[in-house]
Design a protein with these regions (language model features):
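Walker B catalytic acidic pair
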Residues: 299, 305-307, 317
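P-loop NTPase nucleotide-binding/switch module
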Residues: 170-209, 213, 240-294
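The Walker A (P-loop) glycine that initiates the GxxxxGKT/S ATP-binding motif of P-loop NTPases
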Residues: 221, 284, 306
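Peripheral, non-AAA+ core regions of ATP-driven protein-machinery
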Residues: 1-218, 222-225, 265, 330, ...
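Walker A/P-loop
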Residues: 219-258, 324
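Short beta-strand elements
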Residues: 18-24, 282, 386-389
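Basic, amphipathic alpha-helical bundle interface domains used for macromolecular binding and assembly
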Residues: 33, 39-44, 59, 66-76, ...
Length: 513
């Protein structure tokens, strides 16, 4: 008897429906075709044990299973449940015409229990798109899949529940999530707050400018000056995620199985990989490509602590995704594109010893050591970082002050107002949403400056020996400062403030010339 069951495969952040055809005839043998990987080929052992331990059995006949489309490689153990249901239906241990109306996915334990799967959200989205009635999956993934409207989602604990459901012996409890309610309930409660930061008013101002214009930023300071603390609080002042952004972000985290029992992600992600990370782990890849850290930081913040400690080759592969806001991973027979629109926040010590030009420091590095230290960060990468700011240690008087600083919610209000101005400014441009994304043509159009401002900029570049690449960055940051003030034109004092935020472009900094 021939039976069809439907599962799904995830490629990139999109799902493709897989038709599982199970045919049972007289004879012996178990044949599984359609480019399954090792985990799927091993499923017959898990299925046999699970069925035996729940009172069922694999028939002693010839079983042929085809996973179509046959030219698409399938991977993982998430097909266990669909294969098992297909075998039972083909052997008439399940009597139902409803099986073909559902996507069925789940990894089987030997006792018949179900383990969670990866990619439940994109699978649910594709199931709704193709008109399936429902999605049966492990209970741990039910809330995540139930984000999708107009699709019946049933979370189950074991295979026996599914068998009894299709045999009409029991009803399954549908998982229902009020997506908007869940999303907005968690939206206003960031984990960290700028009110906790003592002192560092100049750096806080820089973080506000970076958030308002989407500018990448690097923090330079000795150990213990608060660089990591400041970076962790940046997501709390970024504009709240829209429902569309939240869905997009949740899909990526779903693919790697990082969604717990939370459903829709409502906070912007903050990713902080260790400096020993490989290039594949950072940008994504592998034999079966998976999203990397830059994609997991999509719509959020990627924090690279101790930037010069990262391998130069690892940093270099990040250059193109920073520019394109996406990363494409190519293999011989296919390519996958992951979104990677994130804000880069980097931090570094001012020298290998951690101190620079500090007479009280116990160790100072030689010029040669500092040159080697800085050479790990290439010019093209620094070219993509708009704001460089030095972070100094906080004096004892400010550390011991009990007064709270300005809260993240207050700063966020100003950031949102500035972003609204930019949304209106760039409404005719499809791929530009904030100031950091402007190219030379848009800078000329939207960052017009007076003769006085030009004179100030020229003098600063000559006296401070700023590099040529700093020119456009200064104008973009100045435009954001003007937006925060709500002024139409870039004024001289906006230029003056933006010039301060180009520390690494100054001649003499680590031997720059």
């Amino acid at each position: 008897m021939l039976v069809k069951v439907y599962g799904s495969a995830v490629f990139g952040v999109e799902a493709t429906t897989i038709t599982i055809e199970v045919n049972i005839v007289k004879g012996i043998g178990y044949h599984l075709v359609g480019l399954p990987d090792i985990a799927i080929k091993e499923s017959n052992f898990r299925i046999a044990a699970a069925l035996q331990n729940t009172g069922y059995k694999i028939p002693g006949k010839k079983i042929t299973i085809n996973m179509a489309p046959a030219d698409m490689r399938k991977e993982g153990s998430a097909y266990d449940l669909s294969l098992a249901i297909g075998i039972l239906a083909a052997n008439e241990q399940i009597q139902s015409d409803e099986i073909e109306k559902y996507i069925i996915m789940g990894e089987l334990s030997l006792d018949g229990g179900l383990q969670p799967i990866k990619g439940a959200l994109p699978i649910a989205i594709q199931a709704r798109k193709e008109g399936f009635k429902g999605f049966i999956l492990p209970a741990q993934n039910a809330k995540e899949a139930a984000i999708v409207d107009n699709l019946e989602v049933y979370g189950v604990e074991n295979i026996k529940e599914v068998i009894n459901f299709f045999n009409g012996e029991r009803e399954l409890v549908r998982t229902i999530v009020d997506t908007r309610k869940e999303f907005y309930k968690n939206l206003e409660f960031p984990e960290f707050d700028f009110a906790d930061v003592k002192g560092q008013e100049t750096v806080k101002r820089c973080m506000e400018i970076a958030a308002a214009g989407g500018h990448n930023i690097i923090l330079i300071g000795p150990p213990g000056s608060g660089k990591t603390m400041l970076a962790k609080r940046l997501p709390s002042i970024l504009p709240p995620m829209t429902l569309h952004e939240a869905l997009e972000t949740t899909k990526i985290h779903s693919v790697v199985g990082r969604i717990k029992d939370t459903g829709l992600m409502s906070h912007r992600p903050f990713r902080s990989p260790h400096h020993t990370i490989s290039d594949v782990a950072l940008v994504g890849g592998g034999t079966y490509p998976q999203p990397g850290e830059i994609s997991l930081a999509h719509n959020g913040v990627l924090f690279l602590d101790e930037l010069p400690e990262f391998k130069r080759a690892v940093l270099e592969v990040m250059r193109q995704p920073l520019e394109d806001r996406e990363v494409t991973i190519s293999r011989a027979k296919f390519s996958i594109t992951y979104p990677s629109s994130f804000m880069l926040v980097a931090s570094m010590n001012p020298s290998p010893s951690g101190y620079f030009n500090d007479p009280e420091a116990p160790v100072n590095s030689t010029p040669a050591e500092m040159q080697r230290y800085m050479s790990k960060i290439s010019g093209p990468l620094l070219d993509r970082i708009d704001i460089h700011i030095e972070v100094n240690p906080v004096p004892f008087e400010k550390l011991s002050d009990d007064r709270k600083g300005e809260s993240s919610s207050e700063i966020r209000k100003r950031v949102i107002a500035a972003r609204n101005i930019q949304t209106e400014r760039f409404k005719e441009y499809e791929h530009i949403h904030y100031n950091a994304q402007m190219n030379t043509k848009q800078i000329q159009k939207f960052c017009k400056v007076s003769e006085e401002s030009l004179k100030l900029l020229k003098n600063a570049m000559m006296k401070l020996n700023l590099s040529a690449r700093a020119y456009d960055r200064i104008l973009k940051v100045a435009r954001t400062i003007a937006d925060l003030e709500g002024t139409d034109n870039v004024q001289p004092h906006h230029i003056g403030e933006a010039i301060q935020y180009r520390s690494l472009d100054r001649e003499g900094w680590f031997g720059n010339s």
